[in-house]
């Protein structure tokens, strides 16, 4: 049995992963780690670690991992460039998987949105994400991943064209503008819409998650797979290509 350590075990995703692991036949829980716990014990007793914590938590995890390399499956969102750079550096000595969303449906949405962005170059792009009232970061990591994909498909720098809100008399929408909007309320697990709008028609691509178990089960499958991989950086596409279930 592969021993999985859960880093950020008290969070919503941490609790969901713990629950899903109870019925997993290939893996079991080694340590439930929360802030202030024993990192040395986490690394010693785990074959692979799943991280759904916070940006500061992920930063701490990566720093410690350099002293005791272990496969890391990271799903924490809101990471800045400093942490992403640290992640890339650490992946030279251990396998690291990072994704802002670990569902097959979102991977396909990202692929389709990129293709649509290329094919519908004259269409305006707007992205809307909806989550529960407790979500701390905005826009969601998934929304930003989608925005990066559609911008890249048009050879645009997202930082120069992204709009995160509109208010007052702001003038007409610019040609290359990509809006990323956030809604928060209730217990919405996650809904992402990428819309392409032109005079007389529009196309909207949607993905809705109805249970966190979708992401938890995905994270567990990825962690099991990652435990057998060599040191490098991995993405959701690497995982799905390995399964040969979809070519992205």
Swiss-Prot record:
The keyword Transferase does not apply. It catalyses: (S)-2,3,4,5-tetrahydrodipicolinate + NAD(+) + H2O = (2S,4S)-4-hydroxy-2,3,4,5-tetrahydrodipicolinate + NADH + H(+); (S)-2,3,4,5-tetrahydrodipicolinate + NADP(+) + H2O = (2S,4S)-4-hydroxy-2,3,4,5-tetrahydrodipicolinate + NADPH + H(+). Catalyzes the conversion of 4-hydroxy-tetrahydrodipicolinate (HTPA) to tetrahydrodipicolinate. This is 4-hydroxy-tetrahydrodipicolinate reductase. The keyword Ribonucleoprotein does not apply. NAD(+) binds at residues 8-13, 75-77, 99-102. (S)-2,3,4,5-tetrahydrodipicolinate binds at residues 132, 141-142. Its EC number is 1.17.1.8.
